[in-house]
Amino acid sequence: MRAPEDLPDDNPGSVAPYEVGQFVHDNLELYYEVHGQGPRVLVFLHGILMDANMNRRLAADLAAEGNRVILLDLPGHGLSARPQRASFHRMDTYAGHVLALLDHLGIDQAVMGGVSLGGNVSLLVAAQAPERVRGLVIEMPVLEWALPAAAITFVPLLLASHYARPVVGVVAKAFRALPRTGNGPFDSVMNMLSAEPRETAAVLHGVLAGPIAPTVDQRAAMDVPALVIGHKVDHVHPFHDAQQLARRLPQGQLIQANSVLELRVHPERLTAEINGLLDSAWSGPAGRVRRAG
């Protein structure tokens, strides 16, 4: 791994230096970042079509509290490989890449977490390899109540990426030419708008075609410290999904965010809650994520 150059001190989006690396899994080169050191590991995953930029400040803040936070760009996102076949972008396939990252870094157990897509993938990691999950941090899960709104939102994007490809391609090229700001969440949105339409279509198709979350019985078997963050702003991330997930997880705790952007714009309160979850997950014996059925 290598450390990037320090960002300017006067850049409001700057964070402490961190290490970056790549590894290959299923013939795909995947990019990751490691913030901080030590045995208290959190893997935190980005939302759909976003990348590690959106969570970099959170990673730095948690690293300053003695945690090791790992950010992974999933296939089709950020600096990782961008295969244009939908089969590469199923959420359960993404979960396999996360487990391969733990193997690559020699990590036996980690707290798993993420926002939206990343939260769902974290739940699938817990279902696939329960012995490796120490706890869960799930921000804005997309579960049963979200499906109609998610379909209404993403199916038009998928169709536009297929059938309006020349127009979308021109827009993406224009965004690629724009300088990045150093503000992680804003740059993550710019990177999303810069993607080639075939890449975007493959991600959306794969995510919509495959399983989006573990079964209800599998969720009920995840007996580890779990923090669920929800909000009441948009229908793609309905607060009811967050409520139901927190109730279903044996150790689930629900926190209501003040807005969809609180953890990115005014992160102090929620960052403290996440650090408290990490304290609980790593302070005693490991909980149990059982294999349902």
Label for each model-derived stretch:
Residues 235-241:
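Conserved alpha/beta-hydrolase "acid-adjacent" motif
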Residues 222, 228-230:
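Short beta-strand/loop motif that positions the catalytic acidic residue
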Residues 251-293:
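Catalytic active-site module of serine/aspartate enzymes centered on a nucleophile-bearing elbow/loop
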Residues 188-217:
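Hydrophobic, aromatic-rich cap/lid helix
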Residues 71-113:
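Active-site loop/oxyanion-hole signature of alpha/beta-hydrolase fold enzymes
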Residues 123, 127-128, 134-163:
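Flexible "cap/lid" loop of the alpha/beta hydrolase fold
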Residues 28-81:
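Conserved HGGG/HGGXW glycine-rich cap/lid loop of the alpha/beta-hydrolase fold
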Residues 114-118, 122:
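Gly/Ala-rich beta-loop-alpha elbow adjacent to hydrolase catalytic centers
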